[in-house]
């Protein structure tokens, strides 16, 4: 019953995002890589998770888990039910960062797809903020490949200071998957986790340069 509710929610979301926001999806071939995958989008709007969910093919959604901030996704019984139905697990970077990382690592160890927003919070101005080193730790410990993912248009549609969205186009671009070693070689920082996180951010930014 719970899983059926999740599929219904995801189906309605796909129709809404494609109809209202004219969702465009690029780079789906990046999701065919073997092994566990960590999908790492930039985060500028509440619409971001909805856009990624609508962009992912059904074959991927079956095995996809999501990191959801407890202050939003687990605030109240209805939201908790919705989160369980759509395979969202709680993350609280302020009170229990280790707990969220442990749940994420468990999902990747089981070779699932994991959607993780490395900035931690929505950007106040639409610019891509520094990525937190936790994502580097996840990639390093799990052996998962990271898929840099760029969301364009969500900030213009629903920035932090706006209550109701503008129905403008949103584009989701999935980039080439990278290993921890590749990302560490691309990035800068005082630790391996920081270098991996920075390399991943640069890979997301590069998707905008190539648009």
Which ranges hold each PLM region?
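Helix-to-loop junction immediately C-terminal to a conserved catalytic motif
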Residues: 6, 13-43
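Catalytic core of membrane glycerolipid acyltransferases/transacylases, capturing the structured
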Residues: 33-94
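Structural motif corresponding to alpha-helix initiation and N-cap regions
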Residues: 25, 75-76, 98-101
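Residues at the C-termini of beta-strands that transition into short coil/loop
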Residues: 29, 70, 92-95, 150, ...
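Alpha-helical membrane-targeting segments
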Residues: 1-20, 74-86, 158, 162-169
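Non-catalytic C-terminal accessory region of glycerolipid acyltransferases
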Residues: 4-8, 98-211
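Short, flexible loop segments at the rims of nucleotide/cofactor-binding pockets, characterized by
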Residues: 14-20, 90-94, 125-126
């Amino acid at each position: 019953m719970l899983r059926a509710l999740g599929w219904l929610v995801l189906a309605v979301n796909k129709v809404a995002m494609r109809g209202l926001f004219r969702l465009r999806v690029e780079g789906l071939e990046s999701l065919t890589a073997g092994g566990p995958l960590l999908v790492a989008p930039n985060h500028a709007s509440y619409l971001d998770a909805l856009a990624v969910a609508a962009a992912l093919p059904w074959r991927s959604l079956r095995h996809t888990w999501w990191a959801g901030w407890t202050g939003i996704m687990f605030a109240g019984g209805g939201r908790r039910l919705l989160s369980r139905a759509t395979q969202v697990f709680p993350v609280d970077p302020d009170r229990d960062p280790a707990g969220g990382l442990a749940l994420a690592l468990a999902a990747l160890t089981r070779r699932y797809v994991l959607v993780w927003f490395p900035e931690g919070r929505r950007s106040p101005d639409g610019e891509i903020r520094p990525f937190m080193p936790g994502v580097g730790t996840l990639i390093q410990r799990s052996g998962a490949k990271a898929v840099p993912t760029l969301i364009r248009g969500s900030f213009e549609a629903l920035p932090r200071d706006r209550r109701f969205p503008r129905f403008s186009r949103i584009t989701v671009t999935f980039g080439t998957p990278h290993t921890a070693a590749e990302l560490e070689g691309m990035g800068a920082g005082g630790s391996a986790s920081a270098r991996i996180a920075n390399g991943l951010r640069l890979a997301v930014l590069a998707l905008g340069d190539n648009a």
